[in-house]
Amino acid sequence: GKKRDGQALTTEEIRYVVDGYTRGEIPDYQMSAMLMAIYFRGMDRRETLDLTMAVMHGGETLDLSGVSGVKADKHSTGGVGDKTSLVLVPMVASLGVKMAKMSGRGLGHTGGTLDKLESIPGFNINLPMERFLENVDRVGMVIAGQTANLDPADKKLYALRDVTGTVPSIPLIVSSIMSKKLAAGADVIVLDVKCGDGSFMKTLDDARELATEMVEIGKMAGRKTVAVITDMDEPLGHAVGNALEVREAIATLRGEHKSELLELCLTLGACILTQAGLAADDAAARAMLEQTIADGSALKKLAEFVAAQDGDPAAIYDPALLPAAPVQMEVPSPASGYVRHIAATDVGLVSMRLGGGRATKDSTIDYGVGIVLHKKVDEPVAAGESLATIHAADEAAARKAVAELTACYTITPDAPPAAPFIKAIIR
């Protein structure tokens, strides 16, 4: 009742509620009332930090103290075609920054990094803790499933937020994301906050509020924290799928593929290097990161990482070894003009229906299917020119996807106003 009446909760009260709920001593109906009160009344920063720490202490934490060097972690608020980790992590790992990631699987319109990695023949995401820590120390990077039970409190709270309609609350989002990031043990945390159609925060103001809150909570908890706000009014890069996204990541690391994906990785990477004290400023950091592509060290690191997790490193040098879909079909543009908008969420759902994602937790994935976009926002297109290529398991699925994908594109006679991809950096 205290929060309902608009009062702040004490540290002890917050801890009592989170612990009690996690242990099953506080029933769902009481916790639902608390979530509704937080949703309507909000929380101040001290309460948000207390909530974050209480949720974090509800699970195990990852002890990286035995790992030498600077440890960094990146979190993305999600997005379609988001293969950032596959490019960014090898780049910074080749420069000596250690990155240990425990990832989730994809559900719905966003693909999980683990599913993308599992499209590489032999790749193993299930590592015992000992090997997880040994790999991050020796290779400099590890991306695996949840070895430790880092977030039992968050899982339980999230499920309840989902059914009570309290997902879009800043203190609840911040405590959910930051409890996991703090539990993951890194010194430097960089947050990739998406804003726009394909994301959770539809406006720049909302994204800025969320990013600022997360950065402040990270700093209060003693971590170097930065957030980058990026536009998500279209999928990131060109590929959406699993093996197709791995192919795009490889092409980017080979320097063959320039897109906003590379720009994002350079920006996030520069934040990590400057925060870690490995570069004097963003310009120096970007030069170091570009060098890892030019000299092949980032690609080599990706292959080393794949081999260290039982995957076939040859697939990194010869992407023809990755799974491929038997049917490819072009999506002709219905009109001439400029691409104004690509509905990211809908593109993700097209990929999911092709078999590239999960509608439910138990769905199986077809690693070869997906979509490769040829025309992105701002680009001119002629009627009949290919907007994208559908990669499908059979002709019928491909034809259905062609119609669905055509509907994802908005084409206008005039060029749209150019909007910057990177909206803001919050330090």
Q: Where would I find each of the regions flagged by the language model?
A:
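Well-ordered secondary-structure scaffolds
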Residues: 10, 166-169, 173, 183, ...
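Short beta-strand segments
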Residues: 102, 136, 144-146, 177, ...
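Phosphate/diphosphate-binding glycine-rich loops and adjacent basic-rich segments that engage nucleotide
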Residues: 138-186
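A glycine-rich helix N-cap at a beta->alpha junction
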Residues: 116-142, 212-218, 222
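Alpha-helix C-terminal capping segments
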Residues: 40, 87-99, 180-185, 220-221, ...
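Short acidic, glycine/serine/threonine-rich loops at helix termini
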Residues: 85, 103, 110-115, 146-147, ...
